[in-house]
Design a protein with these regions (language model features):
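Glycine-rich phosphate/adenosyl-contacting loop at the front of the ribokinase-like
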Residues: 1-68, 107-109
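Conserved N-terminal subdomain of the carbohydrate kinase-like
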Residues: 46-120
Length: 120
């Protein structure tokens, strides 16, 4: 089975202890691509990232999960979106997003969609 996911994988910061945060990568579409790969599907991901250290780290993360990244575009002047998860005393989560400079927000503006979908 061959499946392609399109979306945004972001930098995730979650509070581990008081003022200590764990950094990972997540996003609904990226998580789906990873889980499908783990189940044995030929999974690929389409998004746009920057050329910075964390963008490269995210690409490595997806490759380690055996998600194909050949249709991930790199922006010269944009980077990854970021979100923070905060738990209140009852354990309920709140999310805070920083996406104004996200490369994925402009993915379809900078890509020939017809050519891309023909490649898939």
């Amino acid at each position: 089975m061959r499946i392609c996911s399109i979306g945004e994988c972001m930098i995730e910061l979650s509070n581990v202890e008081h003022n200590i945060f764990r950094q990972s990568f997540a996003g609904d579409t990226a998580n789906s691509a990873i889980y499908l790969s783990r189940l044995g599907a030929k999974s690929s991901y389409i998004t746009s990232v920057g050329k910075d250290f964390l963008s490269k780290k995210m690409l490595n993360f997806l490759n380690e999960e055996k998600v194909q990244t050949h249709n991930i575009f790199q922006s010269k002047d944009k980077t990854l979106g970021l979100y923070l998860i905060q738990n209140n005393k009852k354990g309920e989560r709140s999310f805070f997003y920083w996406r104004s400079n996200s490369a994925a927000k402009t993915l379809l503006e900078n890509v020939n969609s017809k050519n891309l979908f023909n490649q898939i």
